[in-house]
Amino acid sequence: GLERYDPETRPMVEGEDYRVMTPRELRGLRNSRGICIGTARANPGRQITRPEHLTNPERNASLARTHQALAALGVDALISIGGDGTLMTANTLNRYQDMLPEGAHRVRIIHVPKTIDNDYSGIDFTFGFFTAVDVMSKELLNLRADAIATQSYFVVEVMGRMAGWLGYGVSIAGEAHMMVGVEDVVGELVDESAGSRDGIIPVYLDLDALCDRVIQLIQTRQAKGKTY
């Protein structure tokens, strides 16, 4: 709703674009499941890729409308909650405000690093990471029990975006026998035929090489009498 704000044709509507929460609604919220305020994939700063874009009307239009909407509501502080993308948006909005003339409405911005990926630099852990490891490792242990009972193998994929923290945390706690994270895609696991894009050589996983490694693991375990 904030990105579509227009003071004349698209003002902010309570109950549709924003919600005023009372102390009663907040009571006991800390230990409840889910996200009472919902989630969003909006990114008003997606067109800002260079510093000069902050003052470009075509590039900063969405960001400007978001700032104007917050100002219209009298919001003086914003707490952003999320991962890397949310952090970038919060930072872009803060930098945009630095470009505003003196006396313009300013919103103080605080970012809370909540992501299961644990891929932030500068801090040891993000909250949400350990919860995700705990929940997913229990599922992995259930699969391990099934694998032993049925003499089977399971392949499990977890999230993690650009880092293997979550995968390794789940693998260790869930007693997996093999783990491949993004940091492990080196050497023989790299698909050399991928080529380059815009002068950048992306790193892709070679699935054939990965299959060879999985087969090697299976054969090694079978030699030890473990067919799971």
For the regions a language model picked out, list residue spans one by one:
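Short, ordered loop/turn segments at secondary-structure junctions
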Residues: G1-L2, R41-A42, G83-D84, V107, ...
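Glycine-rich nucleotide/cofactor/substrate-binding loop typically near the N-terminus or early
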Residues: G1-L73
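Short glycine/serine/threonine-rich phosphate/pyrophosphate-binding segments
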Residues: L2, G45, N60-A64, G83-T92, ...
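Short acidic/His/Gly/Ser-rich catalytic and metal-binding motifs that mark active-site loops
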Residues: G45-T49, N118-Y120, L189-D191
